[in-house]
Regions:
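Class I S-adenosyl-L-methionine-dependent methyltransferase catalytic core
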Residues: 1-89
Length: 89
């Protein structure tokens, strides 16, 4: 299988008939499977309007936030740079 050096994603957000719970479920599924597509030293560049979802779900799935940038205070948009956490012995 081919593994990626980086994954760049613009995550969906609550709008119209889509509920916040449905968006949370998408984040759960994304963080639950993305490690299978990344090299060990791979990174995720993630654009999000759901800042509160990113850190806890990333940590729960073996990722850490290297950097966080606020893009628009008005729109509540952020870019996160994440990498995988490994136990180094």
């Amino acid at each position: 299988d081919y593994l990626f050096d980086e994954v760049i994603t613009d995550m969906p957000f609550q709008m119209g008939h889509v509920t916040e719970e449905e968006i949370y479920g998408l984040y759960l599924r994304f963080f639950g499977c993305i490690a299978g597509f990344l090299k060990e030293d791979g990174i995720i560049i993630l654009y999000s309007r759901n800042r509160g979802f990113v850190r806890p779900l990333a940590a729960r799935n073996g990722f850490s936030v290297l950097k966080e940038y606020e893009i628009s205070k008005k729109e509540g948009t952020y870019v996160f740079i994440l990498n995988r956490i490994f136990n180094r012995r």
